[in-house]
Amino acid sequence: MTQLKQARKGIVTPEMEAVAKTEGLQPEFILKGIADGNIVIPVNKLRKNLKLCGIGKGLSTKVNANIGTSTDFGSVASEVEKLKMAEMVGADTIMDLSTGPKINTIRKAILENTCLPLGTVPVYQAAVEAKDRYGAMVKMTADDLFGAIESQAREGVDFVTVHCGVTRQVIDTFKGQGRLTDIVSRGGTFTAGWMVFHGAENPLYEHFDRLLDICREYDVTLSLGDGLRPGCIADATDRAQVAELLVLGELVKRAREAEVQVMVEGPGHVPLNQIEANVRLQKSICEDAPFYVLGPLVTDIAPGYDHITGAIGGAIAAAAGADFLCYVTPAEHLSLPDVTDVRNGVIASRIAAHAADIVKGVNGAAERDRQMAIARKKLDWETQLKLSLDPEHARVTRDRFKTRGKACSMCGDFCAMELAEKHLGVSVSRC
């Protein structure tokens, strides 16, 4: 039985208990959230020794790290190195977005080397193999696509991004809309290109029940991809984006009826003043399904710093109710990310997630900041480093300049904490 089916039967599974313990909540809270469809636990029934992760309403905001090869660059060793870095700095899940050679070997190596939930975009495998087999991606068959989905489910993939909402009607809306950046989702482009070439409906939509059968058998969580997400802020919240979202709302209902866990992906590039509205719209249309956002990026003019533009948008989105942040790295729009980019991307998104969790009232979030404030007042550097999101970087920065006393090298003899104690009678308890 799937986690959703067991939740509806009132069965608290070991996975629900583990997530409850991590979140500091009662197992019954997790059970109800899964039964209602506003919490998911991505866990393929074939995966063992997984570090379980709950995503959704009332839980801490989670962070995903994308890794994977491109057609020109990448190797098993480099992707495993990125994987280990993402794990080390606190990613909650991993997605393999490989499109290069040895795509199956890469995915299997990632599965063998991680205890985190793994997600994929199966159309990438189907497209790569169709190009090799038939000479063109668009010549893949529906069976090729569903074959890729099922083979990955058998391997143990925990969640899959599928662009089911890119329908013929939605494509007509997109064509009538007019956009600056057209379609920027690779999976969305592959799907739309296939539909135009064959003059046919999206097989993931037309045969959605077949997809549900696979996911139900292996308890793979569906992540309904936003193939028409805006690729620039000028395209944000347009008719094409909303038309696809309406379809995804229908598919959320069908997935729940089939007792398959489901979450929904979202934009993309969105200006600050539209982010909250986007979250509210998704939550309404998709009946409070967990919301998984890429960023969103709040400006288009910061290549090299898009981990920052994404963290700004991610903090606002998560504070408004988004549940799951897909990290953005400094390499976004420029190149394949390297291991340093992965580190910076995860940390930036974790900062955004934590900032939002304070607003959400997530269990323990504000208390960590309170403990940091106490440690700072005491000039207790070890506790400050321990509480920081990136202790290694904080320690290196702290140690760049050696000081005579306990104050940092910025203030020295003019430390505000020490002066307050000396002249205002505000006690600073020394560590």
From Swiss-Prot:
GO terms for molecular function: 4 iron, 4 sulfur cluster binding; carbon-carbon lyase activity; zinc ion binding. GO terms for biological process: thiamine biosynthetic process; thiamine diphosphate biosynthetic process. [4Fe-4S] cluster binds at C408, C411, C415. Signal peptide: none annotated. It catalyses: 5-amino-1-(5-phospho-beta-D-ribosyl)imidazole + S-adenosyl-L-methionine = 4-amino-2-methyl-5-(phosphooxymethyl)pyrimidine + CO + 5'-deoxyadenosine + formate + L-methionine + 3 H(+). Substrate binds at N66, M95, Y124, H163, S185, R186, G187, D226, G227, L228, R229, E265, Y292. The keyword Lyase applies. Pfam families: ThiC_Rad_SAM. Zn(2+) binds at H269, H333. Binds 1 [4Fe-4S] cluster per subunit. The cluster is coordinated with 3 cysteines and an exchangeable S-adenosyl-L-methionine. Catalyzes the synthesis of the hydroxymethylpyrimidine phosphate (HMP-P) moiety of thiamine from aminoimidazole ribotide (AIR) in a radical S-adenosyl-L-methionine (SAM)-dependent reaction. Belongs to the ThiC family. NCBIfam families: PRK13352.1, thiC. This is Phosphomethylpyrimidine synthase. The gene is thiC.
